[in-house]
Design a protein with these regions (language model features):
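Short basic/glycine-enriched coil/helix segment immediately N-terminal to the Walker B
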Residues: 27-31, 104-107, 120-130, 154-156
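Conserved P-loop NTPase motor "coupling/switch" region that bridges the ATPase
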Residues: 60, 89, 131, 139, ...
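SF2 helicase motor core recognition
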Residues: 118-122, 171-173, 332-336, 358-362, ...
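Conserved helix-turn-beta segment of the N-terminal RecA-like "Helicase ATP-binding" lobe
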Residues: 71-95, 183-186
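Conserved pre-motif I regulatory segment
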Residues: 2-36
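A conserved SF2-helicase RecA2
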Residues: 400-461
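Conserved Helicase C-terminal RecA-like lobe
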Residues: 1-4, 14, 28-29, 40-42, ...
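Conserved helicase motor
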Residues: 70, 90-99, 114-119, 141-145, ...
């Protein structure tokens, strides 16, 4: 579709990249389509421009965006405010009644998370949506799940569906089946077993491996589709910075609030030093991450399911290897255990790993398929190491040093890096968002730390 007369609304100083314009034009011409552009290429903006263009032509009235909880506000809502400020936008999150009320309202764009679709199925069907956009669409790869069946039922009442993921069928060629059944059902057999036979064959009673032509079949059934890899987008900046929200669980919030109340009592009438502010803020960050050290050096674990899920989503969407920087020792173990449960290979580099073992881990990370993820304590490996097999850095929590932050990011930004890089910041509290801003702006000073600590105590959780 020709968007030559479209005005491409943008904030001052921002212009669409060529690949974003091409992606928007492709999607605008297709009622149902895939967008497989890699993480960090600006898929969200392309979708917003395409839908806004169709709305201006009166071909579209309402859009439902289905995405992970971690990017409802930090990606979709913020980008809609940037690139479609003239449109009505609402986030359907909270109680079931609140979500249903928002869906039944007059917002032109409604953003909801995966689980919310099942809760609000009837309201979505009756909501007058012309198009559904599914971000991180791999969540719908399994056609046997209730999540998939709910979307299938909804799509019987909605004309358009765009599915976005940077890593289609990354784990197995059979992952393409659920996606294809939603966009292009005629391309795949009626039954999953038939498709599995097309793309895999058994080598033992319990082990199946991909057929030599599996990727060709996957590419054929996942159509119509557009894909840009970061290395193809020559106008992209070398490093793209992204943010993911991971709301604290009810257990975390309870103890976070209690700790703030205790700090408020302690701070009454006292002069706050930078050292004291750093220690106290560190405790709050520990709770947000899922493990806190008591004054007696014991470790108390919290339910950090939202944060772990946000991390897994980033890893799943990454096309190459990933570095995860984690300031707290015990949280590193939590993450390692979680990735193991998810079938994601990882290794740990922290202060307790001997030099010889560290050298071996780095060599395998750079040269072999596994490990896919390195979980790193920033203070232990922010200098010197070359880790260019990764093109994505994840900050599980902010660190108290601009130098450490910059040096850690530089582990992937070294000679030998062949891809455009992405740095993702995970946050679950306002103080983390402010700390990341200080790090990005290179202004992490003692004065700013004390100021931030006082601000945090003055705000109710």
């Amino acid at each position: 579709m020709n968007l030559s007369e479209y005005d491409w609304p943008c904030p001052t100083g921002i212009t669409p990249f060529a690949h974003q314009k091409e992606t928007a034009a492709f999607l605008a011409a297709k009622p149902k389509a895939f967008c497989f552009n890699e993480q960090g290429t600006g898929k969200t903006a392309s979708v917003i421009w395409a839908t806004d263009y169709l709305m201006k032509l009166k071909l579209l009235k309402r859009v439902l965006v289905i995405c992970p909880l971690s990017i409802m506000s930090s990606a979709w809502q913020q980008d809609l405010f940037k690139f479609a400020v003239h449109r009505r936008v609402a986030v359907a999150y909270g109680s079931a009644n609140k979500r249903k009320e928002i869906i039944s309202g007059d917002a032109e764009y409604v953003i909801i998370n995966f689980d919310g679709v099942q809760i609000c199925k009837a309201e979505i069907i009756a909501g007058g949506f012309d198009l559904i956009v599914v971000d991180e669409a791999s969540a719908y790869k399994n056609a046997q799940t209730e999540r998939w069946k709910t979307l299938r039922d909804v799509m019987r009442h909605v004309k358009g569906l765009w599915m976005l993921t940077g890593t289609p069928a990354a784990q197995s060629p059979t992952d393409a089946y659920g996606l294809a059944k939603l966009i292009n059902p005629q391309a795949v057999p009626t039954f999953f077993g038939q498709f599995k036979d097309m793309v895999m064959y058994p080598v033992t009673k319990f082990k199946w491996v991909p057929r030599p032509n599996a990727q060709v079949v996957v590419s054929r059934v996942l159509q119509p589709a557009i894909r840009f890899e970061k290395r193809q987008c020559i106008d992209l900046p070398d490093i793209t910075y992204l943010y993911r929200e991971a709301p604290m669980t009810s257990q975390q919030l309870k103890y976070y609030k209690k700790l703030k109340e205790d700090m408020l009592i302690e701070a009454a009438g006292e002069e706050v030093s930078a050292v004291n502010a750093a220690v106290k803020l560190n405790k709050l960050l520990q709770i947000a991450c899922g493990s806190v050290y008591t004054d007696t050096k014991e470790v108390v674990d919290f339910d950090a399911g939202n944060r772990l899920q946000a991390l897994k989503e980033v890893i799943d969407e990454a096309s190459h290897k990933v570095l995860v920087f984690v300031p707290f020792t015990h949280t590193i173990k939590q993450i390692s255990d979680h990735l193991t449960k998810c079938g994601i290979s990882s290794e740990i580099i922290n202060g307790s790993v001997p030099v010889n073992a560290r050298t071996d881990i780095v060599k395998r990370f750079q040269e072999q398929q596994d490990p896919r993820v390195l979980i790193i304590q920033p203070q232990a490996a922010s200098h010197g190491l070359t880790l260019t097999a990764a093109d994505t850095v994840v900050w599980y929590a902010p660190v108290p040093s601009v130098e450490t932050y910059l040096q850690a990011n530089a582990r992937i930004d070294r000679p030998g890096q062949k891809n455009t890089m992405t740095v993702v910041h995970i946050m679950g509290s306002a103080v983390e968002a402010k700390l990341y801003t200080l790090l990005r702006n290179n202004v992490y000073s003692h004065e700013e730390l004390v100021k931030l600590y006082k601000q945090e105590l003055s705000e109710t959780t």
